[in-house]
Structures are given as structure tokens and as C-alpha cells.
């Protein structure tokens, strides 16, 4: 690129191309990194969700060591990094907890409060699962998905405990399992 005034277009490609994408857990196999990678960013708008995912992807995400002060209720109740509002205030005002704007919330706060599947160990193909809101009888994963999909299709969330932590399969995953 020339230093000539108005000449801002570059005519050659990038000199050094990356052959592999960056992996944030390549050398850091700590428990904290696994928890950060498994974290679900809920209660935020699409843009803030993308920003938080970028921070996680490139090892720029730093978890909070102690709760921060909420800008609405002025209590030390903010437990998520980079958020400015606590969960109750963000839910009440229906705004993004990170930027404070009245945008569409990608993953609402209320999802983790709905009925869940409890796992009695590490999940395999047909591991015993218990559903707290039903008869509490063990069943295979396919039978539970079929049965609960018919009764609680709109509100059920599968919570799978994996080595790294909790992973949520929302409505789209539920439709795939029950179809």
C-alpha cells in the first residue's frame, strides 16, 4: 500500500496465511478453561452473544472473581462477566444484561428454570436418565426423549452432564430428538 494520498486499496493478498485456526484449549487444559468453553451466554442480545463467544474463542474471556454492582438495583448481584445488570433486573426490564439495550434476547433467562433431566452418571448411548416431573423411573435416552417430547415438548430442556460441564440442548435439539 502506498503512502500516496487517496490510495487506500491494496493490490496484493495477505503475505502469511494461517494454516490452522486458533484453539483456545490447545495448551491450556485447565478446569477453568473447560468451564469457560462450556458456558451458555443467556440473557443477552445477538451482538453481545457474538462478542462473548469471540472472547471465549480467542481466550480473552475472564470470569468474575466476585459479584459486580448492578446499574439498576445498585446491589452486588451481577455474577456474569461483562454484564452490567443482574438477572432479575434484566428480566423485569426485558433488556440485554450486557449492553442494557432493549433488543431481542437470543437465549432467555427463564430456560434454565424449566424442568430438567437428571443424569445418574456420564451419558452414553442408552444411559439411565430420570425425569423429575414424571414418575422418576429410569429409562433409556431414546424412550425418555420420545415420551417427554409428547408431554412437555414446549418447555423441556435436556441438560447433559459431560466431562466439561453442562451443555444445553434447547427447543431445536428437542425437535430433532422427538421426530
UniProtKB/Swiss-Prot annotation:
UniProt keyword Acetylation present: yes
Q: Which key words are in the record?
A: Acetylation, Phosphoprotein
Disulfide topology: none
Xref: InterPro entries: DUF2039
Gene (UniProt)? C9orf85
Q: Does the keyword Ribonucleoprotein apply?
A: no
Species name for this entry? Homo sapiens (Human)
Tell me the residues on which Phosphoserine occurs. Answer: 137
Q: What is the lineage of its organism?
A: Eukaryota, Metazoa, Chordata, Craniata, Vertebrata
Q: Which Pfam families match?
A: DUF2039
Residues the record lists as N-acetylserine modifications: 2
State what protein this is by name: Uncharacterized protein C9orf85
Amino acid at each position: 500500500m502506498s503512502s500516496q494520498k487517496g490510495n487506500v486499496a491494496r493490490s496484493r493478498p495477505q503475505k502469511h496465511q494461517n494454516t490452522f485456526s486458533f484453539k483456545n484449549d490447545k495448551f491450556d487444559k485447565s478446569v477453568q478453561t473447560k468451564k469457560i468453553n462450556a458456558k451458555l451466554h443467556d440473557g443477552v442480545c445477538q451482538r453481545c452473544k457474538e462478542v462473548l463467544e469471540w472472547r471465549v474463542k480467542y481466550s480473552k474471556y475472564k470470569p468474575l472473581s466476585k459479584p459486580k454492582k448492578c446499574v439498576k438495583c445498585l446491589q452486588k448481584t451481577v455474577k456474569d462477566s461483562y454484564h452490567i445488570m443482574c438477572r432479575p433486573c434484566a428480566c423485569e426490564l426485558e433488556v440485554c444484561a450486557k449492553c442494557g439495550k432493549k433488543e431481542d434476547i437470543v437465549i432467555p433467562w427463564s430456560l434454565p428454570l424449566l424442568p430438567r433431566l437428571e443424569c445418574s452418571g456420564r451419558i452414553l448411548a442408552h444411559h439411565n436418565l430420570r425425569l423429575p416431573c414424571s414418575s422418576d423411573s429410569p429409562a433409556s435416552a431414546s424412550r425418555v426423549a420420545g415420551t417427554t417430547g409428547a408431554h412437555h415438548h414446549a418447555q423441556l430442556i435436556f441438560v447433559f452432564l459431560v466431562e466439561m460441564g453442562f451443555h444445553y440442548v434447547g427447543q431445536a435439539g428437542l425437535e430433532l430428538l422427538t421426530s
